[in-house]
């Protein structure tokens, strides 16, 4: 079975494309998923992309727990839970799955309360301010990370 990447999106990301487009852009979550599936294929690596979005902290935690032993890497945009959720941090630490934290906007150019992340110091990498392209960068990073550790055999060189 090919290695899998779990894409997790937190609160309000179901509104992507319509919620504050000047900050988050006009790409919908559905369109983004299509792009990311194509990105996985373009890497010439046999990867499976799984996705889950919830506005509920407990549902995200349950999905992280279910990933243990079943997922090789997580790409997460925790949304507002970035700044508030010790529980999400503990769930990610508890399953010991490497992850990248993604933010569409540059959180450091926004309100002060958005500058603090409960996840960043546990992440393999943090990507912010690249718009939805940040997700593509995270998927590429995850593929390379898995390849370097022998988790995935390349069909062709990256």
Curated annotation (Swiss-Prot):
Q: Which reaction does it catalyse?
A: 3-dehydroquinate = 3-dehydroshikimate + H2O
Q: Which GO molecular function annotation, any one, does this entry have?
A: 3-dehydroquinate dehydratase activity
Known EC number: 4.2.1.10
Record bears the keyword Lyase: yes
Pathway as given in its UniProt record: Aromatic compound metabolism; 3,4-dihydroxybenzoate biosynthesis; 3,4-dihydroxybenzoate from 3-dehydroquinate: step 1/2
Any one Gene Ontology BP term: quinate catabolic process
Top-level lineage group: Eukaryota
Q: Where is this site: Transition state stabilizer?
A: 19
Q: What is this protein called?
A: Catabolic 3-dehydroquinase
**Annotated source species:** Pyrenophora tritici-repentis (strain Pt-1C-BFP)
Question: Which taxonomic lineage does the organism of this UniProt entry have?
Answer: Eukaryota, Fungi, Dikarya, Ascomycota, Pezizomycotina
């Amino acid at each position: 079975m090919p290695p899998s990447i779990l894409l997790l999106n937190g609160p309000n990301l179901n509104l992507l494309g319509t919620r504050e487009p000047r900050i988050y852009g006009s790409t919908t979550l559905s369109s983004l998923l299509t792009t990311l599936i194509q990105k996985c294929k373009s890497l010439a690596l046999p990867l499976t992309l799984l996705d889950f979005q919830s506005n509920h902290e407990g549902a995200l935690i349950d999905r992280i727990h279910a990933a243990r032993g079943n997922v090789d890497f997580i790409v997460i945009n925790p949304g507002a839970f970035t700044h508030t959720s010790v529980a999400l941090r503990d769930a990610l630490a508890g399953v010991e799955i490497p992850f990248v934290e993604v933010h569409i906007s540059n959180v450091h150019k926004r309100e002060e309360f958005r500058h603090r992340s409960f996840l960043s110091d546990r992440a393999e990498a943090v990507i912010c301010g690249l718009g939805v392209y940040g997700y593509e960068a995270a998927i590429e990073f995850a593929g390379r990370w898995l390849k370097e550790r022998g988790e995935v055999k390349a069909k062709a060189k990256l």
